[in-house]
C-alpha cells in the first residue's frame, strides 16, 4: 500500500508533498500490482488533537486532507480504507463514536471528489462488536466495504486444533451484524486487508496456514485477501520472501494456488471426507480443483472414486493415484471425477457440520475432559501440548495449569453474534496437594472482552465442585480467536483439575 497518510502529505498547513507517493504508485503500476489507500493520521502541526489520536477536533483539516488525496489519486486509487485496525492506533479514551465521526467526514469528502471511489470501514482482528458500535454511533450508510485483520483466528487454524468453523464463520458473522444494524449494506464486500502467520512453528506451518486461509476465505466469500507480508521487513518474520529476497514454502504455496485456482477462485462447494474432515472444490484454471486436509491433528483416507492428481502446494510436486492419506498439510487435487463435483455443488449451501452435528437448535454445548474426552459442540484451544490429560481421584480430568488460561470456543451454529443469556457451568477440583486454586471467567460480550461477575475459589480437593456463571450480554464473534477463558491470573492459582464445562442457553431474562 502506498503511503497516503495525512502527516506524510501535508507536512505544513497547505503545503502538499506528492513526490514519494507518486513514485510508489508509479512502481506499483509498473509491476501491474493493484493497490488501495489508507486515510489515516494527523500531522504534527495539528495541535487540536494529541499525537496518536483520531483527529476529531480538526475535522475541517481532516476533510480537506481527504479531499486533496482522493482528488490527487483519482483514476489510480479507488478503494480507501479509513484508519488502520481501529481501535488500535487511536487515543486510549477514544470511542467508536469518534471513529464514526471521521468515517462520516471522510466518506462525504471523498464522494464529493470521486463519486466512484469506495470507502472501507475498518476494525482490528475480527472485532465485529466495535464495527457494530461504530455503525450505531453514526457511520450507518457511510461505507462501501468492510476490512478485517483476523490474525488470531488463523493462528488457531494453523495450530490444527479444529477451529476451521471459526474461520469459516467470519463473513457470515459480518453479514449477521450488518443485516441487524445496516440492512442496506448487508452484502457489501468483506476484505482481509491484512492476514498472515509468522515462522514461530516453522516455514511449513506458515505455508499451510496460507493455503487454508485463502481456501476458506474464498469459500466463505471474502472479496480479497492481502497476505502480510510479501517480504520480511515490517515485523514477523512473516514474509513470503525472507529479508534477502529468498522464497519460503509460503511463496511456493501462493504460486501453486494461483496456478491452479487462478487470481479469483470460483467456489463450487464442499464434500465430506469422512468424520469431521471437509474438502473445498473450486473451478480452477484447467478444471475443478479440490483443496483438502484433515483437521484437528487427525488423518483420514480420501478415495475419490477414480485416479486423480495430487499436488503438494508447498513444493509443487505431483503424484497420481486412486487413494490418499490426508493430514493437517493441505493438498490440491485435479482431474476430479464428475460425481465428486456434482456432490460438492449440491452441498454448497448446506451446513458443513465440522464437529459432527448440527448445533443450530441445541440448547447447550459441553465438553468432558480426560482419557475419554467428549466434545459436544464445545472445544478447548489449550491443546494437549499445554495441558495433558491426567487421571485424578479415580476419574478423568484435565490439568488447569494452562499458560494464559483454559480457552474455549463454541460451535458457531450454536451461537454466533446473536445475543442470548448463557449459563456456564464448570466442574473442577483442587490438585492432590490441595493448593489454593481458582479462576475468573473471561468472555466475549457486546462491549468486547469482559470478566464475569466473580472470582471462583475452588474450596478443596475432597470432591468435585461446580462453579456457575451467568452471562447476560455474551456476543461471540471470535475476534481474539476464542469465546471463553478460565484465567487464574498467572501460575499461582491454576493448580486444579477440570472435569467438564457446559454452556447453556437461558431463556428467562432477569
Regions found by a protein language model. Name each.
Residues 1-154:
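Substrate-binding cleft and catalytic face of glycoside hydrolase catalytic domains
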Residues 96-214, 220:
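Noncatalytic carbohydrate-binding groove/subsite architecture in carbohydrate-active enzymes
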Residues 196-259, 268-277, 285:
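Aromatic/acidic polysaccharide-binding cleft in carbohydrate-active enzymes
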Residues 272-307:
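Carbohydrate-binding surface patches
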Residues 319-356, 470:
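C-terminal beta-strand-rich structural cap/linker in extracellular carbohydrate-active enzymes
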Residues 344-415, 502-504:
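Glycan-recognition and processing domains
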Residues 401-475:
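Extracellular ligand-binding interfaces
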Residues 466-500:
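Extracellular beta-strand ligand-recognition surfaces/modules
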Amino acid at each position: 500500500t502506498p503511503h497516503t497518510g495525512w502527516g506524510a502529505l501535508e507536512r505544513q498547513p497547505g503545503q502538499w508533498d506528492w513526490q514519494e507517493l507518486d513514485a510508489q504508485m508509479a512502481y506499483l503500476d509498473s509491476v501491474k500490482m493493484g493497490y488501495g489507500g489508507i486515510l489515516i493520521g494527523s500531522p504534527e502541526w495539528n495541535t487540536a488533537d494529541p499525537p496518536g489520536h483520531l483527529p476529531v477536533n480538526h475535522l475541517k483539516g481532516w476533510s480537506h486532507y481527504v479531499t486533496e488525496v482522493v482528488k490527487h489519486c483519482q483514476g489510480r486509487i479507488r478503494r480507501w480504507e479509513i484508519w488502520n485496525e481501529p481501535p488500535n492506533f487511536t487515543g486510549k479514551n477514544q470511542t467508536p463514536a469518534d471513529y464514526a465521526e471521521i468515517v462520516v467526514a471522510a466518506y462525504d469528502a471523498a464522494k464529493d471528489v470521486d463519486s466512484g471511489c469506495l470507502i472501507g470501514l475498518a476494525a482490528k482482528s475480527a472485532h465485529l462488536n466495535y464495527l457494530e458500535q461504530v455503525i450505531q454511533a453514526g457511520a450507518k450508510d457511510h461505507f462501501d466495504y468492510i476490512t478485517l485483520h483476523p490474525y488470531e483466528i488463523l493462528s488457531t487454524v494453523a495450530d490444527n486444533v479444529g477451529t476451521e468453523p471459526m474461520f469459516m464463520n467470519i463473513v457470515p458473522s459480518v453479514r449477521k451484524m450488518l443485516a441487524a444494524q445496516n440492512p442496506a449494506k448487508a452484502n457489501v464486500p468483506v476484505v482481509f486487508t491484512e492476514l498472515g502467520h509468522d515462522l514461530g512453528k516453522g516455514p511449513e506451518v506458515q505455508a499451510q496456514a496460507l493455503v487454508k486461509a485463502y481456501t476458506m476465505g474464498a469459500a466463505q466469500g471474502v472479496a480479497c485477501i492481502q497476505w502480510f507480508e510479501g517480504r520480511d521487513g515490517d515485523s514477523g518474520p512473516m514474509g513470503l520472501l525472507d529479508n534477502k529476497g529468498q522464497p519460503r514454502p509460503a511463496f511456493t504455496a501462493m504460486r501453486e494456488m494461483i496456478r491452479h485456482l487462478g487470481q479469483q477462485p470460483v467456489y463450487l462447494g464442499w464434500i465430506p471426507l469422512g468424520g469431521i474432515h471437509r474438502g473445498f472444490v473450486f473451478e480452477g484454471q484447467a478444471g475443478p480443483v479440490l483443496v483438502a486436509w484433515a483437521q484437528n491433528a487427525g488423518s483420514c483416507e480420501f478415495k475419490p472414486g477414480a485416479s486423480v492428481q495430487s499436488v503438494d502446494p508447498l513444493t509443487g510436486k505431483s503424484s497420481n493415484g486412486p487413494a490418499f492419506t490426508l493430514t493437517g498439510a493441505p493438498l490440491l487435487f485435479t482431474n476430479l471425477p464428475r460425481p465428486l463435483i456434482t456432490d460438492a455443488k449440491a452441498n454448497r449451501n448446506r451446513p458443513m457440520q465440522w464437529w459432527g452435528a448440527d448445533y443450530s437448535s441445541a440448547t447447550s454445548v459441553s465438553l468432558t475432559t480426560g482419557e475419554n474426552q467428549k466434545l459436544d459442540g464445545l472445544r478447548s484451544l489449550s491443546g494437549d501440548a499445554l495441558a495433558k490429560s491426567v487421571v485424578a481421584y479415580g476419574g478423568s480430568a484435565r490439568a488447569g495449569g494452562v499458560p494464559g488460561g483454559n480457552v474455549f470456543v463454541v460451535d458457531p451454529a450454536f451461537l454466533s453474534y446473536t445475543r442470548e443469556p448463557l449459563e456456564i457451568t464448570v466442574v473442577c477440583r483442587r490438585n492432590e496437594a490441595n493448593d489454593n486454586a481458582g479462576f475468573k471467567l473471561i468472555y466475549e460480550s457486546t462491549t468486547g472482552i469482559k470478566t464475569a461477575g466473580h472470582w471462583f475459589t475452588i474450596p478443596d480437593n475432597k470432591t468435585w465442585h461446580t462453579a456457575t456463571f451467568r452471562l447476560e450480554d455474551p456476543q461471540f464473534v471470535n475476534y481474539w480467536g476464542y469465546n471463553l477463558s478460565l484465567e487464574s491470573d498467572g501460575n499461582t492459582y491454576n493448580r486444579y483439575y477440570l472435569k467438564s464445562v457446559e454452556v447453556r442457553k437461558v431463556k428467562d431474562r432477569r
